[in-house]
Amino acid sequence: MSKRDFYEVLGVSRDASERDIKKAYKRLAMKFHPDRNQGDDSAADKFKEVKVAYEILTDAQKKAAYDQYGHAAFEQGGMGGGGYGGGGQGDFGDIFGDVFGDIFGGGRRGGGQARAQRGSDLRYNMELSLEEAVRGVSKEIEVPTLVECDICDGSGAKAGSSAQTCGTCHGHGQVQMRQGFFAVQQTCPTCNGKGKIIKDPCNSCHGQGRKQKTKTLNVKIPAGVDTGDRIRLSGEGEAGEHGAPAGDLYVQVHVKEHNIFERDGNNLYCEVPVSFSMAALGGEVEVPTLDGRVNLKVPEETQTGRMFRMRGKGVKGVRGGGVGDLIVKLVVETPVKLSSRQKELLREFEETCCGEAASKHKPKSEGFFSGVKNFFDDLTK
């Protein structure tokens, strides 16, 4: 079956820029990627076709050869042997891994010695109370992970033996295959890219060099952390392959809601109830802080919702910047479950203080009802 023109495959003109080619490739690769089309062989074929077209058209030398000779430049026996296409010479994800890596994070290694892979990073979600987050705390945690095998010291080989250099790739982890004018690297099928072969594997880790284990760690949480902060423990992630460096452990902080305080940055907020008599006459009210109780002076004629700032009673920031404040909102409480005598006294108070002739005692009401009157007067004009 004749091969489609590479420009047609990507849906671009022959004078398209490299940027346009790359843009078209990304769109089509996402559309036909096997992970999105599991079990669809036609999508897999289109995905491979798109990758090959992109690899040729973004390489100046290959593109020039294709523009001059077309598909014949890469056909087996046509110009140097080897082909770019075909059904089964290895995994196309390995052949063009570096091309596709910018989208899916892949990519092939260079031509040097194969390197063992660094261990994966891990994440641990830690929940703290507000007090723990503000003051700092040490916590013991248990983390399931992969650790270096203590029997073979991570080599994967049985005691008295060692891993042997792969005879196929000579330790490089890759082999070359010819494609027309060009040589393309592919993951070694013998050692799977590791560069070494373990002929006598360790019985404990079965040649992997790592084993599953739950580690117990003591984590020191600095004072002032907040939800979203992340603490890095270097080298406490999964062990690397065959002696490679371990990954890191990231402790993700989440601070639980508090029944009194709310936090915003380094400031704390709370509501404190006061009686309506204290709000009218003034006095002192006890206010909770993270360091204990303190007294707040309430001026006379205080209205509900009034805010007071208590400097230095907030949180000391984990990144510096000083200590925040405690913002106190006073809420005037309406008395409930009154006795007959209390109700009688309030009615007397209402007559002397809150009647129509006593508007000076209720400034908010006077302003409100005056505004309402003006509103309706304007409507009737």
Swiss-Prot record:
Residue numbers binding Zn(2+) 1: 149, 152, 202, 205
Protein's GO biological process: chaperone cofactor-dependent protein refolding; DNA replication; protein refolding; response to heat
Domain commentary: The J domain is necessary and sufficient to stimulate DnaK ATPase activity. Zinc center 1 plays an important role in the autonomous, DnaK-independent chaperone activity of DnaJ. Zinc center 2 is essential for interaction with DnaK and for DnaJ activity.
CXXCXGXG motif repeats: 149-156, 166-173, 188-195, 202-209
Subcellular location: Cytoplasm
Xref: SMART domains: DnaJ
Quaternary data: Homodimer.
J domain ranges (all copies): 5-70
Name of encoding gene: dnaJ
Protein name: Chaperone protein DnaJ
Free-text function comment from the UniProt entry: Participates actively in the response to hyperosmotic and heat shock by preventing the aggregation of stress-denatured proteins and by disaggregating proteins, also in an autonomous, DnaK-independent fashion. Unfolded proteins bind initially to DnaJ; upon interaction with the DnaJ-bound protein, DnaK hydrolyzes its bound ATP, resulting in the formation of a stable complex. GrpE releases ADP from DnaK; ATP binding to DnaK triggers the release of the substrate protein, thus completing the reaction cycle.
One Pfam family named in its UniProt record: DnaJ
Organism: Vibrio atlanticus (strain LGP32) (Vibrio splendidus (strain Mel32))
